[in-house]
């Protein structure tokens, strides 16, 4: 069993973009930024326990950090992990109303 403290460290924030809003409407899929060292099972249990919804599947993607230029220096943004969480039909993940 994963501790409550670990659940809160797994999920970092929702990823808001045009693609994520389309996937939410069409496929009932939520996109979240998660910690880089988490597994799919940890993500699934964290979402189910924190938001009280049933998760159908979890898919993860590593996003490579971009190379940015700042005056005459090159700066690299850090890599991060994104999780596509498919919620079962009839359930919805609303971030503002489910937080206790």
From Swiss-Prot:
Matches recorded under Pfam families: Ribosomal_L23 (PF00276)
Keyword terms, alphabetized: Ribonucleoprotein, Ribosomal protein, RNA-binding, rRNA-binding
Any GO BP: translation
Residue stretches spanning the membrane: none
Cellular component GO terms, alphabetical: ribonucleoprotein complex; ribosome
Molecular function GO labels: rRNA binding; structural constituent of ribosome
Assembly information from the UniProt record: Part of the 50S ribosomal subunit. Contacts protein L29, and trigger factor when it is bound to the ribosome.
HAMAP family recorded: Ribosomal_uL23_B
Family that this chain belongs to: Belongs to the universal ribosomal protein uL23 family.
Biological role: One of the early assembly proteins it binds 23S rRNA. One of the proteins that surrounds the polypeptide exit tunnel on the outside of the ribosome. Forms the main docking site for trigger factor binding to the ribosome.
Name of the protein in its database record: Large ribosomal subunit protein uL23
Organism: Buchnera aphidicola subsp. Schizaphis graminum (strain Sg)
Name of the coding gene: rplW
């Amino acid at each position: 069993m994963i501790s409550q403290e670990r659940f809160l460290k797994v999920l970092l924030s929702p990823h808001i973009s045009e693609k994520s809003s389309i996937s939410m409407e069409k496929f009932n899929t939520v996109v979240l930024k998660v910690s880089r060292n988490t597994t799919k099972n940890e993500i699934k249990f964290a979402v189910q326990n924190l938001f009280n919804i049933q998760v159908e599947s979890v898919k993860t993607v590593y996003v490579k950090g971009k190379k940015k230029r700042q005056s005459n220096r090159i700066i690299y943004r850090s890599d991060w992990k994104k999780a596509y969480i498919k919620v079962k039909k009839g359930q919805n993940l609303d971030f503002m109303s489910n937080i206790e």
